[in-house]
């Protein structure tokens, strides 16, 4: 069921991941698409993964306890003046995702909806489905979105945190690089 769940979305930067029988979904979008994505999906939880998280207003329909802001730059190695994704960041993301009750959708966003958010969504898919093959998930992402470019550092940290023994990084290699775009396009991944 790749590519069909968000056909009604007017904004080109939303992604949905179906998470199982009850059909809760993880929607991934850009900052620009956040209000519309939350409104259209009825999401109860929002995960913000970007620099300058203070600029992100929590959608009024989302409770303060259900909005996690994780401040990190979209970089793959330590750089002066930037905040590299860290083990602490990934622990926060994974704990938040595991605490989501799946009663209503979760929205994960970064600035453009291409790198940090898709990496966090990939990590969430692996965390919520520990027996699902990483390459299968990555191939579905690539098939659904030629521009998805999950941040390799985030994926590597999640791989270690989830005990995937490098399989998530090998899945990124299998996935290949994304096409260059300013913002992401909609796509759907079935989790199980």
Describe the residue ranges of each PLM region.
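Catalytic cysteine-centered active loop of the rhodanese-like fold, especially the PTP/DSP P-loop
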Residues: 98-128
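Active-site donor-binding loop signature of nucleotide-sugar glycosyltransferases
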Residues: 5, 51, 70-74
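N-terminal polybasic/positive-inside topogenic patches
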Residues: 3, 7-15
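Amphipathic alpha-helical interface surfaces
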Residues: 89-93, 106, 116, 120-121, ...
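Glycine-rich, flexible N-terminal cofactor/catalytic loop recognition
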Residues: 20-63
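Intrinsically disordered, low-complexity regulatory segments
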Residues: 66-74, 183-184, 192
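PTP/DSP superfamily signal
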Residues: 100-105, 126-192
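Helix-loop module immediately N-terminal to the HCX5R catalytic loop
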Residues: 72-106
């Amino acid at each position: 069921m790749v590519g069909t769940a968000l056909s009604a979305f007017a904004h080109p930067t939303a992604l949905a991941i179906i998470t199982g029988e009850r059909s809760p979904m993880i929607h991934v979008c850009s900052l620009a698409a956040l209000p519309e994505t939350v409104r259209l999906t009825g999401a109860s939880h929002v995960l913000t993964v970007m620099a300058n998280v203070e600029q992100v207003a929590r959608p009024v329909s989302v409770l303060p306890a259900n909005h996690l802001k994780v401040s990190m730059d979209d970089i793959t190695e330590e750089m002066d003046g930037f905040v590299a994704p860290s083990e602490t960041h990934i622990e926060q993301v994974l704990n938040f995702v595991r605490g989501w009750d799946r009663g209503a959708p979760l929205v994960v966003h970064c600035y453009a909806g291409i790198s940090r958010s898709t990496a966090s969504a990939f990590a969430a898919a692996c965390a919520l489905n520990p027996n699902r093959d990483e390459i299968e998930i990555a191939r579905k992402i690539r098939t659904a979105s030629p521009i998805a470019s999950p941040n390799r550092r985030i994926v590597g940290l999640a791989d270690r945190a989830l005990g995937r023994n490098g399989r998530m990084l090998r899945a990124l290699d299998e996935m290949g690089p994304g096409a260059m775009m300013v913002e992401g396009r909609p796509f759907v991944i079935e989790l199980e």
